[in-house]
From Swiss-Prot:
Family classification: Belongs to the metallothionein superfamily. Type 1 family.
Annotated positions binding a divalent metal cation 2: 6, 12, 14, 25
UniProt gene name: mta
UniProt-annotated stretches for the region Beta: 1-28
Listed name of the protein: Metallothionein A
Source organism of this protein record: Parachaenichthys charcoti
Binding site for a divalent metal cation 1: 4, 6, 20, 23
InterPro entries in UniProt: Metalthion_dom_sf, Metalthion_dom_sf_vert, Metalthion_vert, Metalthion_vert_metal_BS
Native organism taxonomy: Eukaryota, Metazoa, Chordata, Craniata, Vertebrata
Region ranges (Alpha): 29-60
């Protein structure tokens, strides 16, 4: 099962392998968040967080 915890307060933590701040997502996936956190460039394909920070690599 997905070890993800997500809160509307904007804090996502996926099994300790990913941390998203100000994500404001309503659901979590193993890719951390189905949405683009603030500071992360939005892309048509959507965003995923890799590592502990969100940068250009968050877009797949």
């Amino acid at each position: 099962m997905d070890p993800c915890e997500c809160s509307k307060s904007g804090n996502c933590n996926c099994g300790g392998s990913c941390t998203c701040t100000n994500c404001s997502c309503k659901s979590c996936k193993k890719s951390c968040c189905p949405c683009c956190p603030s500071g992360c460039t939005k892309c048509a394909s959507g965003c995923v967080c890799k590592g502990k920070t969100c940068d250009t690599s968050c877009c797949q």
